[in-house]
Amino acid sequence: MRLRTRKGSPRSSHGAAGRTARCKRKHSEEDEEEESQLIEEDKLPKQETGLLSTIKNFIKGSTNKEDRENPAKRSRVERDLDNNLITSTPRTGDKPSKPIARVRRKSQVNGEATGYEVSQHMKQNGKLEDLPSTTSPPRTTLLGTIFSPVFNFFSPANKNGTSGSDSPGQAVEAEEIVKQLDMEKVDEFSTSTATNGASYPSLAAPVRSTASSWLEGTEDSPEREIPPLTAPVSPESGYSSAHAEAAYEEDWEVFDPYYFIKHVPPLTEEQLNRKPALPLKTRSTPEFSLVLDLDETLVHCSLNELEDAALTFPVLFQDVIYQVYVRLRPFFREFLERMSQIYEIILFTASKKVYADKLLNILDPKKRLVRHRLFREHCVCVQGNYIKDLNILGRDLSKTIIIDNSPQAFAYQLSNGIPIESWFMDKNDKELLKLVPFLENLVELNEDVRPHIRDRFRLHDCLPPD
């Protein structure tokens, strides 16, 4: 008898195979999950202990610190935003090839840049170089601020003057040169120089002629041409009239005081209505007034030591003490003593009060010779030049005379002015004495002084034609 084996049904076999496949998939998924867990566990820092783990943690920690100090590069926009938070001025070193825009704000005076202006300049290597700001005030010198300043240059080619604004500090540079070269140049001559322009024709205003020639009876013809503006020099100096005529054209181009007077602008309403600086006259006050300049008219002062100085005194200016050396013009005191008896003497200078007032306190402490003193603040500043407008005196101009070594100083009252040679050191000078007879005669006439001064000195004939 044979035994017959029974075969399984196909459904059952398929089911076993399915169960087997499902088990395999389950095991494979479990294996994958275990592997993923192992990978994640490897990524997580292990809590190890001991010396070895401490060293590992130290090494890992230093590496992370370096990564923090050197982060990944960011975009230029992000970097610039962070830099702007640090400083208000963006760096220009990152972009040296890009030009820097220059913005300049023009002022209202001659177009000069007096307002904001970029104070840095780009070098060739792309770096910035600091430049001084144009808004800083100009440098000034002691000589230009204390003593009478030199007038700014005027010429036919420069009708508006050099300054272009009512700034009194712009003639300071020339004043310093004149004062510094004063002793070096003047000491070479044995006689006095007529004006600053004789020794320094490019720096100051020469007087057309000396008062001595007028007082000796020499009168100019109104029909002849304007003479050279070089002051007459003594024969000992070695200069001839031909040399003066040759230098006339050059002097005209450099400076012409009468061209300045011809083109000086008229006084404004505010200047015309200024309150008089002097008190009213009293019964004891003389009827006529004589206005006198100080520097190079009555005295010559210097900050350099002068061996023949008549006196010296200190001046405190801007917290610094300076020593001033003074020479007195010959017959200075005799002239004042005589004129103070018949005139109301008024000192009118373009110098600073801190210097001039102290000098007068030494020369005339009781104000017996000079009744009143006026200083730079009483002058009218026109295009950087100080002009002595006699209207501020509050006196009758028909009985007022001014003596000054610079005719520009009395440009608004030319008929009231008597020019005099500038004095520096000549011990034989007699210009003050020569004026005494004429001044005494004006008082005796008791008339309007202006026609007599005009006929005697003829300054109007020196003005250029229209």
Swiss-Prot record:
Signal peptide span: none
Q: Which PROSITE patterns does the UniProt entry name for this protein?
A: FCP1
Mark out the compositionally biased spans (Basic and acidic residues).
63-82
Q: Answer whether the UniProt record assigns the keyword Hydrolase to this protein.
A: yes
Family statement drawn from the similarity comment of this UniProt entry: Belongs to the CTDSPL2 family.
In this chain, composition skew of type Polar residues spans 50-62
Region (Disordered) residue ranges read 1-136, 211-238
According to the entry, every stretch annotated as the FCP1 homology domain falls at 283-442
> GO MF annotations for this entry?
phosphoprotein phosphatase activity
Q: Where is the composition biased (Acidic residues)?
A: 30-39
Q: Which CDD domains does the UniProt entry name for this protein?
A: HAD_FCP1-like
Function of the protein:
Probable phosphatase.
Q: Which domain of life is it from?
A: Eukaryota
Q: What is this protein called?
A: CTD small phosphatase-like protein 2
Query: Sorted alphabetically, which SUPFAM superfamilies does this protein's record hold?
Result: HAD-like
Q: What class of enzyme is it?
A: hydrolase
Q: What is its EC number?
A: 3.1.3.-
Task: Name the UniProt key words of this record, in alphabetical order.
Answer: Hydrolase, Protein phosphatase
Q: Does the keyword Cell wall biogenesis/degradation apply?
A: no
> A Pfam family name for this chain?
NIF
